[in-house]
């Protein structure tokens, strides 16, 4: 499988290493600032890389969004987070002519976490819910795309909920329709997500801990291996 990388930061450098270990080939890179140290051919547009079978994106909206406006039919695996509503809208339009896979978190374990959450929320309807995520000190967006995804799952299952991002100005007691959302940044934390269900005299916490960023790179490669055999459409872990 010939792979075009969109973005060449820490994550796509891991994708390159792991993909080559699996026998795939990196045939090009698109990055905001071309670098002489990049060991692959560098392009400005997706359509310029004729040899690619698929593109894997770990970048940001500033780089990705203009590329999505171009004319091409290359399958895309998208891991960019930020500006989610706009991103989904653009990807759904694009998916009418080419296969597109999107996940805010490329870990299959996080996908399993969402499935567990779909079962837990109805069972624990009287419990308050608080969401917490922790990442390294270089992550610029907060809350994480994964935490937003977890909140969206809860929103589909509980009526009239609202997110609360900061309680220091609140002077009234917590209501049941609030979902607390908390972000921690520090050190080299790869990624931690906790869902706290707090009831009367008992709590339940469901957690996911990423121990290496390799899980995200391998998840993207695995998605690409399947996506290149798919018809045009919008794919997630639920239907790939």
From Swiss-Prot:
Keywords: Amino-acid biosynthesis, Cytoplasm, Diaminopimelate biosynthesis, Lysine biosynthesis, NAD, NADP, Oxidoreductase. NAD(+) binds at residues 79-81, 103-106. GO terms for biological process: diaminopimelate biosynthetic process; lysine biosynthetic process via diaminopimelate. One of its GO terms (cellular component) is cytosol. InterPro entries: DapB_C, DapB_N, DapB_N_CS, DHDPR_bac, NAD(P)-bd_dom_sf. The keyword tRNA-binding does not apply. The keyword Flavoprotein does not apply. Pathway: Amino-acid biosynthesis; L-lysine biosynthesis via DAP pathway; (S)-tetrahydrodipicolinate from L-aspartate: step 4/4. (S)-2,3,4,5-tetrahydrodipicolinate binds at residues 136, 145-146. Its EC number is 1.17.1.8. It is found in: Cytoplasm. It comes from the Bacteria. GO terms for molecular function: 4-hydroxy-tetrahydrodipicolinate reductase; NAD binding; NADP binding; oxidoreductase activity, acting on CH or CH2 groups, NAD or NADP as acceptor. It catalyses: (S)-2,3,4,5-tetrahydrodipicolinate + NAD(+) + H2O = (2S,4S)-4-hydroxy-2,3,4,5-tetrahydrodipicolinate + NADH + H(+); (S)-2,3,4,5-tetrahydrodipicolinate + NADP(+) + H2O = (2S,4S)-4-hydroxy-2,3,4,5-tetrahydrodipicolinate + NADPH + H(+). It is an enzyme of class 1 (oxidoreductase). The active site is at residues 135, 139. Catalyzes the conversion of 4-hydroxy-tetrahydrodipicolinate (HTPA) to tetrahydrodipicolinate. PANTHER family: 4-HYDROXY-TETRAHYDRODIPICOLINATE REDUCTASE, DIHYDRODIPICOLINATE REDUCTASE. NCBIfam families: dapB. Belongs to the DapB family. This is 4-hydroxy-tetrahydrodipicolinate reductase. It comes from Staphylococcus epidermidis (strain ATCC 35984 / DSM 28319 / BCRC 17069 / CCUG 31568 / BM 3577 / RP62A).
């Amino acid at each position: 499988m010939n792979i075009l990388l969109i973005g060449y930061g820490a994550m796509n450098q891991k994708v390159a290493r792991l993909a080559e270990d699996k026998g795939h080939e990196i045939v090009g890179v698109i990055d905001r600032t071309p670098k002489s140290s990049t060991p692959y051919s560098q392009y400005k547009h997706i359509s310029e890389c004729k040899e690619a079978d698929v593109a894997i994106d770990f970048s940001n909206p500033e780089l990705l969004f203009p590329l999505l406006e171009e004319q091409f039919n290359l399958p895309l695996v998208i891991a960019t987070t930020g500006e989610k509503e706009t991103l989904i809208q653009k990807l759904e339009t694009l998916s009418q002519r080419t296969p597109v896979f999107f996940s805010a978190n490329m870990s299959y374990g996080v996908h399993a976490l969402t499935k567990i959450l779909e079962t837990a929320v109805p069972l624990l309807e009287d419990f308050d819910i608080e969401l917490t995520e922790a990442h390294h000190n270089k992550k610029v967006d907060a809350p994480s795309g994964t935490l937003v995804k977890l909140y969206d799952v809860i929103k589909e299952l509980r009526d009239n909920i609202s997110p609360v991002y900061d309680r220091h100005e609140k002077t009234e007691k917590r209501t049941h329709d609030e979902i607390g959302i908390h972000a921690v940044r520090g050190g080299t934390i790869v990624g931690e997500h906790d869902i706290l269900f707090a009831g009367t005299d008992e709590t339940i916490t469901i957690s996911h801990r990423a121990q290496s960023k390799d899980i995200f790179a391998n998840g993207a490669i695995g998605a690409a291996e399947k996506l290149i055999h798919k018809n045009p459409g919008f794919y997630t872990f639920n239907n790939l």
